[in-house]
Amino acid sequence: MENYQKIEKIGEGTYGVVYKARDLTHPNRIVALKKIRLEAEDEGVPSTAIREISLLKEMHDPNIVRLLNIVHADGHKLYLVFEFLDLDLKKYMEALPVSEGGRGKALPDGSTLDMNRLGLGEAMVKKFMAQLVEGIRYCHSHRVLHRDLKPQNLLIDREGNLKLADFGLARAFGVPLRTYTHEVVTLWYRAPEILLGGRQYSTGVDMWSVGAIFAEMCTRKPLFPGDSEIDEIFKIFKLLGTPDENTWPGVTSFPDFKASFPKWKREDTRKLVPGLERNGLDLLDAMLEYDPARRISAKQACMHPYFQAGSSAYSGRERLQPYP
């Protein structure tokens, strides 16, 4: 660790403390040091985790936060060295003026972002969404899932570009129920197949999270703010309707699905996200598709009409045929 000089603690992530630090081998380079707190610290760092993390160093995409180095210190401490970005999407949304649905909070000290110029209007939401799905497409094409996407791990640089952080960490270290400070890890962006106890899941879990984040960027409010797993499931069912074998073949076989669940009817997406253009509503529906086999992929999302110039009519639920 002699190559890094800690400047200040900047946060407490899912896996441990995050520090802003100076890279002493590169003049003027500021980095984020993520100290990974391992469950069994006395046993050292699992070799599987080291292997997984080493693969992430090979991932280079403008929409992903670069993993610059891995430092294995004292036998049982692991530090991940990332490029430094001082703002995440959650703080960005909170810094929006109250008149725009934000909370008017101050940006972190030292942030040079011009919120008045950037804001979070339709064009900015579309830009962030394009960068988000492109970053996910890149990761999925390298067989890397995120599994814990949320506004807190979408970082924004000083030019107002969005980058994904913490990709691949879930596979290396698991997704804990609580952070090391005993904070509950948020369920608001978790896909229904995980909430219902599914053991086999794929890239679709990330696309569900993107849908929930998309809606939140538009409305400035979380779409499914559950405070427990069952509350989260019911929040989803109340808005999207309780799924059955017709809407989601196989749903009744999930370990945590109960035939006694209340039967809610689906709300109109236009009411959930008022003001979103028709192509945006179409994309949101495709991301919040219950059946993971029919949920839009990141590659397909990149080519969605929402990201093209012009707009076409929103055709509602009947548009959602299985994606090829």
From Swiss-Prot:
Name the enzyme group at the top EC level. Answer: transferase
One Pfam family hit: Pkinase
Q: Which GO terms describe its cellular component?
A: cyclin-dependent protein kinase holoenzyme complex; cytoplasm; nucleus
**EC numbers on record:** 2.7.11.22
The GO terms this record gives for MF are: ATP binding; cyclin binding; cyclin-dependent protein serine/threonine kinase activity; protein serine kinase activity
**Residues that coordinate or bind ATP:** I10, G11, E12, G13, T14, Y15, G16, V17, V18, K34
| Keywords from the named record | ATP-binding, Cell cycle, Cell division, Kinase, Mitosis, Nucleotide-binding, Phosphoprotein, Serine/threonine-protein kinase, Transferase
Top-rank taxon, per record: Eukaryota
Explain the regulation of its activity: Phosphorylation at Thr-14 or Tyr-15 inactivates the enzyme, while phosphorylation at Thr-181 activates it.
Catalytic activity annotation: L-seryl-[protein] + ATP = O-phospho-L-seryl-[protein] + ADP + H(+); L-threonyl-[protein] + ATP = O-phospho-L-threonyl-[protein] + ADP + H(+)
What InterPro entries does this protein's entry cite?
CDK (IPR050108), Kinase-like_dom_sf (IPR011009), Prot_kinase_dom (IPR000719), Protein_kinase_ATP_BS (IPR017441), Ser/Thr_kinase_AS (IPR008271)
Q: Which residues carry this modification: Phosphothreonine?
A: T14, T181
Q: Name one GO biological process term.
A: signal transduction
User: Phosphotyrosine: which positions carry it?
Assistant: Y15
List the catalytic residues: D148 (proton acceptor)
The record's section on PROSITE patterns has: PROTEIN_KINASE_ATP (PS00107), PROTEIN_KINASE_DOM (PS50011), PROTEIN_KINASE_ST (PS00108)
The parts of the chain that form a coiled coil are none
Keyword Kinase (UniProt): yes
Protein kinase domain sequence ranges: 4-307
Role summary: Cyclin-dependent kinase that acts as a master regulator of the mitotic and meiotic cell cycles.
Q: Its family?
A: Belongs to the protein kinase superfamily. CMGC Ser/Thr protein kinase family. CDC2/CDKX subfamily.
Q: What is said about its interaction partners and assembly?
A: Forms a stable but non-covalent complex with a regulatory subunit (SUC1) and with a cyclin.
Q: Report what the protein is called.
A: Cyclin-dependent kinase 1
